[in-house]
Amino acid sequence: MAQLNIDEFLARFRERAQAVKERGIPPLEGDARRIWIESAEHDYMDYSLVGRAEWAVDEDALVLRISLKE
């Protein structure tokens, strides 16, 4: 198993958040367009929250601390 580098792990989430933010909207109409946009908004929020987390190891568990302030 590869060794986990937490800083690189979090950086990948920041990169994913930026990619979601920059990608264009495909040619969709109606409900499909609305669903796609909502999904992209959720993806961005999820990736950006994890990407800005502070981390620690506590009793063999990775602990991510995510501030809810912007």
Roles of regions detected by a PLM:
Residues 1-70:
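Compositionally biased, non-globular sequence tracts
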